[in-house]
Amino acid sequence: MKRGKVMKKKSRFLTGLLSAALALSLCAMPAMAADNGETITSTINTAQKGSLTINKYEGDKQDPEKLLDGVTFTAYKVADIVQSTEAGTTDVKMQPVEALTKIKSDIQITSETKYDDIKDTVDAALAEDANPKLTAFATATTGDNGITGQAVFSEMPVGVYLIVETGAPSQIVNKTANFLVSIPMAKEDGTGWNYDIVANPKNAAVYGGISLKKYGKNYNPDGTFSEVALSGATFYLQRKEGDDWVTVTAPTVSDSNGSVDASGLLTTSANGMINITDLAPGTYRFIEYSAPQGYIMDGQAAYEFTINNDQTVTISDAYKDTLANTIKVVNEKPSMEKQVKTGVDAYGKATDASVGDVVTWKVTAAVPSNVNKLAKYILTDTMSSALTWESETEANLTIETNPNVKLDKDTDYTLTVPEDGTEGGTWTIEFTTAGKEKLAANNVTSISVTFNTRLNKNATVNKEGNLNDASLTYSNGFKSNDEEYPTQPDPKDEVIKNEASVYTFGMNIEKVDGKDSRGKLQGAEFDLYLYNGSETNPTEAELKNNGVKVGHYTTDVYGEIHVSGLKNGTYYLVETKAPTYNVVENGETKTYSYNLLKEPVKVVVNVQYEVDTKTTITTDANGNVTTNKIESKKYVGGENDSGNYKVIIKNNKGFNLPTTGGFGTLLFSGIGVLLVVAGVGVLLSLKKKNRT
């Protein structure tokens, strides 16, 4: 009977303790005993140490893909398990620790106790002024043991422990509720004890997203611009952790909106987007690493934003896009154009001129708003040998800005020019630090430089014309010296080259015998005039008054004159001396002159030309070079569309007659016919009178 009573008491104890252990473990989150095959006994081995393994999941499911590192738990021992045996009966009690009984002497922890029942007492025992204070047994952080999402407390003496989640990543907005766990716990079948406990608490996690859209601000030379979505720009994403910024090496990026490499470098997609999801609440920033060719990379800007606990995003108005939750980042791309004066107030890509004419050129360049941060902003002009730099005075190089700002030579810029009288040569305008600051401070959007050259004898006649090219050299970015920024590449040079052209044309004059064109007439002399008047058949006097004498020329042994360096216009050749020829009469050689042309010979030079610009981009060790080279689109005029006009002039012997086939010949023949008719009429009239 006695033995039976003892067994009944033990059984009641086992059932009660099992219930207590399960109740304690179920106060907040489930815990279970790990079946490690230990020998089952009906009493607790109070000298044995146990362990608590916590597997931490995000959300409310035990999803292996959602194991969470970085969660810290703290264990506080709140009760000892005390065993006593009397008369063969084992009695087990949960005895609260002194830190709790000092606060509340009658505190009890039983199988029915929940954490909320002892919360106030625990809070008081954790206060700084508590004496004694409830101290932590140990802390453990998931992932620290090398297993994702797992934290382990080991060497835990037998007792009841309060488990508190004391640290978690920012996406965890609702921490695991505090829970109690006993070491050991009864096995589920009630047959014994397990000292190695497993708990699987869960959290409510919150994530947010952010988008970045990259725009290219493409400047026209006059400072106007358009914005386009810009692909191929790269960024790093950093997260603020305490006082430090740490690069996010594996952000989650939408496949269609950006890409990321193994280092965490993000690249904008074809639509200029980077779309990042699954960001835990916290403060972040984008740092630009590189910009596409031609664009200026702003490596000093930090595009900061905050993912809030309610999943909203806070973005500074300074770079907030019109798209929701989107940061707007703009890269600027300057441009430059070379032009030549084509009219009173007109400029274009090509004009025509005569040798000796003044040709005025214009270089126009866009000024980026961040020009003051660039190491270089330089304008250069290179003239062909067909262009003479007469002097700085004659060149009258003038710099204008929009809006108008006075720039001081040697303070705001330096100017180097060719020596006076140089055929060809280069001038350079390099803006100083002070000059770049002045441009930025005054919001200057464009610069134009005009200057004069003179077309010289080196001018050639061809469909490419005589080129003059300009270039703009600027730095393609500026980086930060902040040590917490990702290491950025050093800026390189971007060079834009642009051409304009001046055309000139020619005449090939051939003097031949009026009856035999094989006879080439040497020694004929002509004056060539460019006529600007309104007379249909101007006389030599009219040409002298309202024309410009181009030159005086004499036919060579082949009867030819070659004239080049002519612009489009109406020209007249005035013969001032006719060629001569020899005749042997009665054994004696006599010299006679051909007839001198009675009126000027008209020659219209009208070459129609158009040019296109072909752009090529090359890259070298110093940076990128964009060349905008002129290509002929249309070039029509002259013999075989060469720009050279062929003029054949015939001279007759014997009388001072006009050129064969010319209007003068027709007039002379007409007068002769009229005289013959008149003579016949007179004879008929006389005969009639005689009859009467």
Which ranges hold each PLM region?
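Solvent-exposed loop/turn and edge beta-strand elements of beta-rich ligand-binding domains
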Residues: 2-692
